[in-house]
């Protein structure tokens, strides 16, 4: 088995960008969902499922520079932490974020048609489950077969896609450790999914009917699950093409 895709977004909800490698620390992928947008009126982190047009934008954080590409503008600079914090709701969990000064909030407010604030999050603060997520090509192929149209890896927004022939091998990884490149992770649980998985990863418009397919064959405790999440137990760099090793497997 090997890593066939790696990716993340530096701004929660923006387009999930494929990358040649990902650096993992004990807090998770470096640069992943480091920033988020906050709705100051409602006191909560902006939700992708309610704002799918965010996928029409990309956010890259490289060497301290945040570059956001919107349909009609590119906004780039070094984010300035203001020292002002906001404690807001993130899917029923209270998180404390630091407000960021710069042009990004204005650009996104104009794009979304509502006032938003850009904030910086701590590691894992605006991640629904554990910091790393995995899917397998075998599982994506099975979901595509059931949907009747190809499901793109980017629709599932996972940190890593692992190439496998059989579907849902990842179910057997729960509670086990995996080696990926220089890093090691421990798989925690299956990932509950929402209708974001059916959106076109570049436009945010409806593309597939995967959630309904999961409801038919991947229902667990009232949730529709696909892929697994994991914590990092050993930091390191993971490249596309790196071998994936299951601890204890022959």
PLM region spans:
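Metal-cofactor-dependent catalytic cores
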Residues: 1-250
